[in-house]
Amino acid sequence: MNRHFPPSELIINEDGSIFHLHIKPEQLADKVILVGDPGRVDMVASFFDEDSIECRVESREFRTVTGTYKGKRISCISTGIGTDNIDIVVNELDALANIDFATRTEKSELRSLELVRIGTCGGMQADIPLGSFLVSEKSIGFDGVLAFYAGRDEVSELGFEEALMKHLKWNPKAASPYVVSANKELVERIAQEDMYRGCTISANGFYGPQGRVLRCDIHNPEINDLIESFRYEGHRITNYEMEGSAIAGLALLMGHKAMTVCCVIAQRRIEAANTDYKPFVKKLVETVLDRI
């Protein structure tokens, strides 16, 4: 028997759109590009086929454009910053795809979306230069979001987590990190010879949670040295960003394909940054659109 989702759990706006994103089921493509910055949606849409835009929707930090690129139907959606927003976005995308809004029940045939986050990141290994494109084969969530869902351990790599917490001298008062993998088929399709691959930390903040120190000291001043030196079964941690773990983890729980690819705009280990990174991101966007 299909579950029924009451109005308190699934909030549908008067116009038939989902609560936060404000888009309707028919406006969502199977292929979805996720970007953090609402302004980047227009950059992605600038590559779409002429006169192919089906909808432009804006609600809070969430902007959506659906159109086609070389005949492929694609939605580009901005998420804002952080895994808390990702919890909203991925749940609402899944609801749009797999819940019948008229009956408030799960559809008999479930739809699997392709979710690709295009973002920016800070590199943690000196051999990955500024401007590189870096795919997160594994995402390490410092945020704790996945622990609120049943099935967390079944989709996570527990041995990796245990080794990481021991190596980082993990603060027991912090949420335990979770480690999840990107969809292998999607990674193989997009991460070709022009991209690096690695394991990415999704931090739940930009400053202290990524080892940055301004006026407040941090709990573990050696955290980034420990991150750089960590190795597990041939894997190393390559970069920081702030959304990918929740995208990958929730997609695994819901039956969607997901991955994150970022342009490296800061090199934490050599204390360098590139503020003129937009041309690199534009090239990354076009590359992903060709391969998704």
Descriptions of predicted regions:
Residues G234-T238:
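Short pre-catalytic strand/loop immediately N-terminal to key active-site residues, enriched for Gly-Thr
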Residues N2-Y178:
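Metabolite-binding pocket within alpha/beta catalytic cores that recognizes anionic/polar moieties
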Residues G159-Y232:
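Active-site rim beta-loop-alpha module in soluble metabolic enzymes
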Residues P38-V41, D87-V90, N183-V187, E243-A248, ...:
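Short, hydrophobic/amphipathic alpha-helical packing segments
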Residues G122, S139, I201-G208, A246, ...:
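Glycine-rich beta-alpha junction loops
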Residues Q267-I292:
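His/Asp/Glu-rich mid-to-C-terminal helical/loop segments that flank catalytic regions of hydrolases
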Residues Y240-K257, V261:
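Short glycine-rich, acidic/polar surface loops and turns
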Residues F48-S52, D94-A97, F101, I190-D194, ...:
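Structural signal for hydrophobic packing residues in well-ordered secondary-structure cores
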